[in-house]
Amino acid sequence: MTDAPSSPCGQHEALLEALRQTLGAAAILRPDAHDSLDRYQVDWRKRYHGQALAIVRPASTDEVAAVVRLCARHRVSIVPQGGNTSLVGGSVPDDSGQQIVLNLGRLNRVLAVDAANLSMTVQAGCLLAEVQRAADEAGLLFPLSLASEGSCTIGGNLATNAGGTQVLRYGTARELCLGLEAVTAQGEIWDGLKS
């Protein structure tokens, strides 16, 4: 592992340049370059406010892994974010301006629906409403239902173990999950997907 520059400013600029090289400039949003990034830095109730070093929007699991490796190398903490609909502020950066918000909104696809095995493979940034729609189109039911289903994501549902309106009958989000593909804190991709 390469040592990061010692000064915070140099460390941050080196990280941001590495992120631009890895993801492209369009995937990196900076507070100083945009009028408002409140969508990423303030929760939907306007209760929790933060200031990020940058908002990073990867488009693949490999890009997520690369971001995690770069942030670890530069010792910059990450705040993972789905739809930013949480009630507890966990998806909002602190106000230090030194954290990267890792927004998974571009990882938003239903990859497969297997009606025979009653399973689906979806990306972490996929909206709950899209998962429900894909299941319905296959003649199935994805029973997790929340008021925020048009803006909350499956990754956030799993991270918070969302229950929803049918939790007593069908269980929580984690009980509806057969497996995961995840990126470890070291930036390695762990494949625990099953169908």
Protein language model features and the residues they cover:
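N-terminal flexible segment immediately upstream of the FAD-binding catalytic core
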Residues: 1-69, 86-118, 133, 147
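FAD-binding subdomain of flavoenzyme oxidoreductases
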Residues: 109-195
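Short, basic and Ser/Thr-rich N-terminal targeting/leader segments
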Residues: 49, 72-74, 81-83, 152, ...
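Structural motif
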Residues: 26-28, 53-55, 75-79, 85-86, ...
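Short charge-dense sequence patches
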Residues: 11-22, 76-86, 125, 129-132, ...
